[in-house]
Curated annotation (Swiss-Prot):
Cofactor needs: pyridoxal 5'-phosphate
Cross-referenced Gene3D superfamilies: 3.40.50.1100
EC number: 4.3.1.18
Gene: dsdA
Top-rank taxon, per record: Bacteria
Catalytic activity as recorded in UniProt: D-serine = pyruvate + NH4(+)
BP GO annotations: D-serine catabolic process; isoleucine biosynthetic process
Sites bearing N6-(pyridoxal phosphate)lysine, chain numbering: 118
Alphabetized Pfam families for the sequence: PALP
Gene Ontology MF annotations: D-serine ammonia-lyase activity; hydro-lyase activity; pyridoxal phosphate binding
UniProt entry keywords in alphabetical sequence: Lyase, Pyridoxal phosphate
Family as reported in the entry's similarity comment: Belongs to the serine/threonine dehydratase family. DsdA subfamily.
Organism listed in the record: Photobacterium profundum (strain SS9)
First-level EC class: lyase
Name of the protein: Probable D-serine dehydratase
């Protein structure tokens, strides 16, 4: 984009100037529609989510065997929902604002196998590919007990095939660990932001890690290019994969069941606000789609991005989607929130979900670190910086009278509201790495 175009962009979209200045900004989507109006643009529906859910159930006996940590949930990879009342009080005091309703945390940070939200989509896409190959080869049918995949015979079969992915860290972890376990040869192309411990962990599982000095976009492009040379290699495309998206979407019906068990009501008088950290957009986009299918217009999904990597906000706000990157407007895409260090958002997710997302906001690294320290001190929950992007959400929403009026959110509804912060990673961070995070928090 030329300088002239940037000037035109700023004239047309004044918010872009604040993004360029790296200010904390929020934008509530004036183009949001009902689920009924917005759903056709997604190109997927509840039958697709059911298909994904059924596939994960078929694989549950295999997962329970292959990963003993999932045995207690019978091979279903799911995370807890916990109340964080002390954190709510801290936020209210810190930002001098009353947050009505209940504040909860979704602990995808502590999902088994890879310790992040990416355990949903990444593992699902690997399993989908494995199932397809095994069925095509006549080795598996959908009525089989899938625990038979945990044998040397199947590992030898899958060894003929390879998988590649580009990642800032967590997606690579989930795809690398899952692929290696099932038997695939797997290479993970990792951007400059990727943490050393994540690379070390992958290598300990026999994964080939290819390192880049450039950002996420370059790692993905190179991974794609390498895969194209090998007909037996399957490239998992974080930017454009409906399969990954569906893996994440199953979270909606799962959360609905958890809420029912916890006697948490979600309806027109009891709204649900969900705050999702956003990198390229596949994880939060898929989860938001699943939430919309589970709770309809009574759930309000808000994406949180680092001030240095506001790719999805930039793409949806301007309508340019993946035709613009944060680098085009002079933003460096360098952030401590390594899982969110993405300069160009997914065009697939942006176009699919732009009518179903209530809003976006940006948050500085300093705030993420500060909230990381507070979560550890007051709730004894340890998270990585990316996972704290959502923590500012209840403050941003509570402080925006115009948005609350537009969605007809009166005092009573707000008192009945549930605020859910989606913690995306941190459960597998080594203790010395966590100590350095806590030291930076200033708490």
């Amino acid at each position: 984009m030329s300088t002239l175009n940037i000037q035109q962009l700023v004239t047309e979209f004044p918010l872009v100037e604040k993004l360029i200045a790296l200010d904390d900004v929020s934008w509530f989507n004036p183009n949001i529609t009902t689920l009924a109006e917005g759903l056709p643009y997604v190109g997927l529906d509840k039958t697709d989510i059911k298909d994904a859910s059924d596939r994960l159930k078929r694989f549950a006996p295999y997962l329970a065997k292959a990963f003993p940590e999932t045995a207690k949930t019978n091979g279903i990879i799911e995370s807890d929902v916990v109340a964080i009342p002390a954190m709510k009080t801290v936020l209210e005091q810190q930002y001098h604002i009353a947050i009505q309703g209940t504040l909860l945390l979704k602990k995808d940070s502590h999902l088994p196998i890879s310790g992040s939200i990416k355990a949903r989509g990444g593992i699902y896409e690997v399993l989908t590919h494995a199932e397809k190959l095994a069925i095509q080869a006549g080795l598996l049918s959908e009525s089989d007990d899938y625990s038979k995949l945990f044998t040397d015979e199947f590992r030898a079969f899958f060894k003929q095939f390879s998988i590649a992915v580009g990642s800032t860290g967590n997606l690579g972890m989930s795809i690398g660990i899952m692929s290696a376990k099932i038997g695939f040869s797997v290479s993970v192309h990792m951007s400059a932001d990727a943490r050393q411990w994540k690379k070390d962990k992958l290598r300990s599982h026999g994964v080939i890690v290819v390192e880049y000095k450039e950002d996420y976009g370059v790692a993905v492009a190179q991974g794609r290019k390498e895969a194209e040379k090998d007909p037996t290699c399957f490239f998992i495309d974080d930017e454009n994969s409906p399969t990954l998206f569906l893996g994440y979407s199953v979270a909606g019906e799962r959360l609905k069941s958890q809420f029912e068990a916890m006697n948490i009501l979600v309806d027109e008088l009891h709204p649900l606000f969900v705050y999702l950290p956003c990198g390229v957009g596949g994880g939060p986009g898929g989860v938001a789609f699943g939430l919309k299918m589970a709770f309809g217009d009574n759930v309000h999904c808000i994406f949180a991005e680092p001030t240095h990597s506001p790719c999805m906000l930039l793409g949806i706000h301007t309508g340019l989607h993946d035709e613009i990157s944060v680098q085009d407007i002079g933003i460096d895409n360098i952030t401590a929130a390594d899982g969110l260090a993405v300069g160009r958002g997914s065009g697939f997710v942006g176009r699919a979900m732009e009518r179903l997302l209530d809003g976006f906001y940006t948050i500085s690294d300093e705030r993420m670190y500060h909230h990381l320290g507070e979560m550890s001190k007051y709730e004894d929950i340890q998270l990585e910086p990316s996972a704290l992007a959502g923590m500012l959400g209840p403050v941003v929403v509570s402080d925006n009278e115009e948005y609350l009026q537009r969605i007809q959110m009166d005092e009573q509804k707000l008192k009945n509201a549930t605020h859910l912060v989606w913690a995306t990673g941190g459960g597998m961070v080594p203790s010395e790495e966590m100590a350095s995070y806590l030291a930076k928090s200033g708490i």
